[in-house]
């Protein structure tokens, strides 16, 4: 077999020998180098994209946490206020006229919070005797807020002291006159007597879910993928999936970051096709260089 191959090579024309040598020592090595470059580039692009995306989705979670912390600070200034504490302690002992004065006082305190934060739709301060001291300017007068809240899943946990505060997922709301398409996130905090620890009621702050568009949507173009925010039970609260053309084409590469504070998850999906486009550009450049080198040889 070896002897036959040797005779075949010896009898081969010089042009053919040069062509085979050219293929073995120039064309094939360059093709292999090009393939290695493309594979390495693909891995580098994915790794760098993941690193950048991890930073960005962590920043989104940080922005969301910052907004929630601001709501918590404003709520704290309300439920620890001595005048409001006194109103809740004596809510069933004062005259009708005093009750109206109390409502005006609470209204002024809470409306300040509503004015300074544009995404707060309204607030409710409810006492244990069922009195609701404040809604917002779009309040409905034909409902009893305490009865509405009694149907909420968090009500018993707050009332029994199982949880001091609750941040709900997205829900529709019927407490407002303009709430036909209103979708809300609610921050709820139980109120206890500062001195005795006795439960006196709760504070509800309703937040327009569009706040998530402002906090997360501005990063959409920078990331080039679909951003989704899931609540602690992994229900979708916000997503850009229906807003981007070509989104979801191909197998997506998925990354996520869970907030220790809220339990919410920010998830990013980047279509694999987007990475392939980048590698394709590198492939064309590599191919051009190889063709040039072959022409030089």
Regions found by a protein language model. Name each.
Residues 1-12, 51-52, 168:
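N-terminal sensory and localization modules of signal-transduction and trafficking proteins
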Residues 14-92:
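Juxtamembrane extracytoplasmic/periplasmic/luminal helical "stalk" adjacent to the first N-terminal
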Residues 69-105, 126-140:
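Extracellular/periplasmic ligand-binding regions of membrane signal-transduction receptors
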Residues 105-114, 195, 202-244:
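Solvent-exposed, extracytoplasmic
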Residues 116, 129-206:
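Extracytoplasmic/periplasmic ligand-binding sensor regions of membrane-associated signaling proteins
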Residues 135-143, 227-231, 235-255:
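GAF sensory domains
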Residues 180-191, 245-257, 264-266:
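A short beta-strand signature within small-molecule sensing/ligand-binding domains used
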Residues 272-297:
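Cytoplasm-proximal transmembrane signaling helix
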């Amino acid at each position: 077999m070896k002897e036959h191959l040797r005779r075949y090579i010896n009898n081969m024309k010089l042009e053919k020998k040069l062509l085979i040598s050219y293929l073995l020592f120039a064309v094939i090595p360059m093709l292999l180098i090009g393939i290695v470059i493309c594979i390495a580039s693909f891995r580098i692009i994915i790794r760098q994209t993941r690193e950048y995306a991890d930073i960005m989705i962590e920043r989104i979670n940080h922005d969301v946490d910052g907004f929630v912390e601001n709501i918590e600070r404003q709520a704290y200034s309300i439920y620890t206020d001595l005048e409001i504490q006194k109103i809740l302690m004596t809510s069933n002992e004062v005259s009708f006229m005093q009750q109206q004065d109390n409502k005006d006082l609470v209204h002024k305190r809470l409306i300040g919070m509503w004015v300074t934060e544009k995404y707060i739709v309204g607030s409710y301060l409810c006492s244990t005797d069922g009195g609701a001291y404040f809604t917002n300017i779009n309040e409905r007068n034909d409902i009893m807020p305490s009865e509405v809240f009694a149907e909420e899943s968090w009500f018993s946990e707050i009332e029994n002291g199982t949880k001091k505060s609750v941040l709900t997922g997205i829900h529709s709301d019927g407490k407002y006159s303009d709430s036909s398409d209103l979708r809300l996130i609610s921050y709820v905090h139980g109120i206890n007597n500062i001195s005795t620890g006795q439960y006196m009621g709760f504070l509800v702050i309703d937040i327009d879910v569009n706040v998530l568009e402002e906090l997360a949507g501005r990063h959409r173009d920078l990331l080039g993928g679909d951003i989704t925010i899931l609540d602690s039970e992994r229900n979708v609260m916000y997503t850009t999936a229906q807003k981007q053309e070509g989104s979801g084409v191909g197998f997506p590469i998925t990354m996520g970051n869970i907030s220790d504070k809220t339990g919410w998850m920010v998830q990013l999906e980047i279509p694999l096709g987007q990475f392939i486009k980048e590698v394709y550009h590198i492939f064309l450049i590599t191919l051009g260089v190889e063709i040039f080198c072959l022409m030089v040889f």
